[in-house]
Amino acid sequence: MDRATVSLIVLAAGQGTRMNSDLPKVLHPLGAAPMLHHALRAGQSLEPERVVVVAGHGAEAVAKAARAFDESIEVVVQAEQLGTAHAVAQAAPLLADAPGEAVVLYGDTPFIRPETLERMLDLRSRHAVVVLGFEATDPGRYGRLVTRGEELDRIVEWKDATDEERTISLCNSGVICAEAGLLLALVSEVGNANAAGEYYLTDVVALARVRGLSAGVAICDEAETLGVNTRAQLAEAEAEFQKRARAAALEDGVTLTAPDTVFFALDTFLGRDAIVGPNVVFGPGVTVESGAEIRAFCHLEGCHISRGATVGPFARLRPGAELAEDVHVGNFVEIKNAVLDEGVKVGHLTYLGDAHVGEHTNIGAGTVTCNYDGVMKHRTEIGAHAFIGSDTMLVAPVTVGARAMTASGSVITENVPAEALALGRARQVTKPGMATRLMEMFRAAKAAKKKEAP
């Protein structure tokens, strides 16, 4: 099937009152990304020609998050939440002439797999409407899928189901696909004569059957249909996401020495033969190339780590950190918006921000790039093969040339030419015997205070 003819409709209008939050439900973070992004990512696998997000509660924030994922996404607003069919109908003006298929997803159902959506589209060759269903361990209040042989006869919401229909374990996920024009036509015929007075998207199946059209069911694992309506379900979803991410990393040839203690983001990329130690947290935007090692208790976000580099333990890489091949970043080092060229060593207790460090330079313990003047950030440039002595303060903007050195304890406020040695500290003064005399003075003063005390 030509995937260019797929249109995606993502329903994201719900307020999520049970979340007890000012944040729209679909924007709660899951794997360090808005829950909405998970649904969009699954749908993106179909290479849709158009994507329409139906927003409602917090529409402006939802639209911003959707366009942060893909600027081409179109957003419509469902001012009143009158049901799922009503929500899909809001997309009709944008998709009235859309060719090909329409697939409806939900912003609060983050685990639908791309291969599941592919199977749904494959079933479209046999059925006019295809619904995604699952065998529920505890059917509860899910809508039931009533089938006749291999065909789907209708979907019955729990509130409207008979006692016999409630015994059915095949349940509705809400995900549906059909030819775009047909889906919108069926949606326009949906009424609200039901217990909730809502316009149910599920009614399109019965309406299709009235037209003599066939409906079918694609069945997926129940875990894919996990919806998030409460904080407890959000925690459950986070656990499921991390479980999947860890399994995928191991399958892709990554070593996780303590998998259950490593936490991934939605877009984390780890190359084959990368090694990740225990208690590592990946925030958004992290790429770790093949053969790199992240040691225990590191926190990384928005960074790129090249082959052969080692990070940690106890290191923090922030957005804009770029580590070239064979860079070593040791314990209690923080790097932000800084590029470290090949072979740079930053062993411990250092902050490098808004900086560029040339190849094979050594950064001594306690070095700080003083990049902020209270109003603006300034850059530090350090050349190749330089040696920055321990406890050096580099007051930006400042440049240290190639093969230059700074003496330990220096405060560098002026540029250092290539191959020069810079000393920016007071000269040491040594006074023989003064330590003993000072201690005697201090003890005498302390004794005098004790005598004066009442």
Swiss-Prot record:
Residues 1-231 are annotated as: Pyrophosphorylase. Its main location: cytoplasm. GO terms for cellular component: cytoplasm; membrane. Pfam families: NTP_transf_3. Binds 1 Mg(2+) ion per subunit. It is found in: Cytoplasm. Acetyl-CoA binds at residues 365, 371-372, 390, 408, 425. Keywords: Acyltransferase, Cell shape, Cell wall biogenesis/degradation, Cytoplasm, Magnesium, Metal-binding, Multifunctional enzyme, Nucleotidyltransferase, Peptidoglycan synthesis, Repeat, Transferase. It catalyses: alpha-D-glucosamine 1-phosphate + acetyl-CoA = N-acetyl-alpha-D-glucosamine 1-phosphate + CoA + H(+); N-acetyl-alpha-D-glucosamine 1-phosphate + UTP + H(+) = UDP-N-acetyl-alpha-D-glucosamine + diphosphate. GO terms for molecular function: glucosamine-1-phosphate N-acetyltransferase activity; magnesium ion binding; UDP-N-acetylglucosamine diphosphorylase activity. Residues 232-252 are annotated as: Linker. The active site is at 348 (proton acceptor). CDD domains: GT2_GlmU_N_bac, LbH_GlmU_C. Its cofactor is Mg(2+). Its EC number is 2.7.7.23, 2.3.1.157. PROSITE patterns: HEXAPEP_TRANSFERASES. Residues 253-454 are annotated as: N-acetyltransferase. One of its GO terms (biological process) is lipid A biosynthetic process. UDP-N-acetyl-alpha-D-glucosamine binds at residues 11-14, 25, 78, 83-84, 106-108, 143, 157, 172, 229, 318, 336, 351, 362. Mg(2+) binds at residues 108, 229. PANTHER family: BIFUNCTIONAL PROTEIN GLMU (PTHR43584:SF3), NUCLEOTIDYL TRANSFERASE (PTHR43584). Homotrimer. Catalyzes the last two sequential reactions in the de novo biosynthetic pathway for UDP-N-acetylglucosamine (UDP-GlcNAc). The C-terminal domain catalyzes the transfer of acetyl group from acetyl coenzyme A to glucosamine-1-phosphate (GlcN-1-P) to produce N-acetylglucosamine-1-phosphate (GlcNAc-1-P), which is converted into UDP-GlcNAc by the transfer of uridine 5-monophosphate (from uridine 5-triphosphate), a reaction catalyzed by the N-terminal domain. This is Bifunctional protein GlmU. The lineage of its organism: Bacteria, Pseudomonadati, Pseudomonadota, Alphaproteobacteria, Rhodobacterales.
